[in-house]
C-alpha cells in the first residue's frame, strides 16, 4: 500500500526466491536476499506516486519482453505457467546469471548466441529461451557407416514421448543443447557419450559447419519458439 496506494483483498503466496550475488573474480558473497513472492487478483484504492520508480500496468504476456534481469524472467515464467508453490535460488556472478535451482534441482542455462553462433555474454534459462525465441547453441552429430548394399547407413534416434519438441519422431543420431560455458565441440562430445555411450575423441568428429533454424509451435499447451544455431558433425 505504501508504494502503490492499493490495499490487497485477495492474494496467493506463490514462492520463495533466494538471490545470491558473488564478486566476479572470487566466490565472495557480496549480497544475499530472500524474497517472499505473492500475486494478487483483488485490491481496492487508487494508485499513488511512488518514490521507488514509475508505476505502469503491463499485460502478463508482455512482461518477459521487458528489460528484466534473467533470473527475474525465470520466476515470471513460472508465475505465468501457474507453477505450484516453488523455491527458486538465483546465483549471480557480477551481473551475470550463473546458477538457477528450482525446488532443489538445477535448471538448464544456455548462452544466448548471435546468428553466427558466437555467444553474446548473456546467460538464459532453457524455458525462458524457448518462450521468447532466444537464440542458443546445439550440437548435431550424425553417425554413418559403410554398407555393402547401399554404400552407407545413417543411425537415427527415435525421440522419447516426453520430449518438449517433436516427441516420438525420428531424429539425428545424437543432438543436444549446449550448456552455458560449453564450446560446440565440448557439447558434441558430451552428447554422443551421454546418449549413445560413444566416447569419441575430438579428431574423430568432422565439422560440417553451422545450421541456423527458427521454428514456432505449441507443446503441452505452451507456446514454443525455438531459435538454434547448430554445429553439425559427422562421426
What are these model-derived regions, one by one?
Residues 5-46, 161, 195-235:
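Active-site segment of metal-dependent pyrophosphate-handling enzymes
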Residues 106-149:
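Acidic, metal-coordinating catalytic segment for phosphate/diphosphate chemistry
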Residues 1-4, 188, 192:
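Small-side-chain secondary-structure face that scaffolds active or pore-lining regions
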Residues 85-107:
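Acidic/histidine-enriched, glycine/proline-rich intrinsically disordered or flexible terminal extensions
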Amino acid at each position: 500500500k505504501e508504494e502503490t496506494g492499493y490495499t490487497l483483498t485477495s492474494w496467493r503466496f506463490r514462492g520463495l526466491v533466494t538471490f545470491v550475488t558473488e564478486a566476479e573474480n572470487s566466490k565472495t558473497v557480496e549480497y544475499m536476499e530472500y524474497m517472499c513472492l505473492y500475486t494478487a487478483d483483488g485490491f481496492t484504492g487508487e494508485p499513488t506516486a511512488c518514490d521507488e520508480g514509475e508505476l505502469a500496468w503491463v499485460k502478463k504476456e508482455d512482461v518477459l519482453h521487458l528489460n528484466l534481469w534473467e533470473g527475474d524472467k525465470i520466476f515470471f515464467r513460472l508465475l505465468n505457467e501457474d507453477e505450484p508453490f516453488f523455491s527458486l535460488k538465483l546465483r549471480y556472478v557480477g551481473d551475470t546469471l550463473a546458477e538457477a535451482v528450482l525446488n532443489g534441482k538445477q535448471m538448464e542455462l544456455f548462452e544466448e548466441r548471435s546468428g553466427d553462433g558466437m555467444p553474446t555474454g548473456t546467460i538464459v534459462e532453457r524455458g525462458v529461451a524457448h518462450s521468447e525465441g532466444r537464440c542458443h547453441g546445439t550440437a548435431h552429430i550424425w553417425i554413418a557407416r559403410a554398407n555393402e548394399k547401399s554404400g552407407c547407413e545413417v543411425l537415427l534416434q527415435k525421440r522419447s514421448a516426453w520430449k518438449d519438441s517433436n516427441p516420438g519422431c525420428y531424429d539425428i543420431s545424437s543432438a543436444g543443447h549446449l550448456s552455458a560455458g560449453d564450446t560446440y565441440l565440448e557439447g558434441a562430445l558430451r552428447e554422443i557419450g551421454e546418449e549413445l555411450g560413444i566416447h569419441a575423441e575430438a579428431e574423430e568428429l568432422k565439422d560440417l559447419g553451422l545450421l541456423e533454424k527458427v521454428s514456432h509451435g505449441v507443446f503441452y499447451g505452451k507456446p514454443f519458439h525455438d531459435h538454434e544455431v547448430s554445429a553439425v558433425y559427422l562421426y
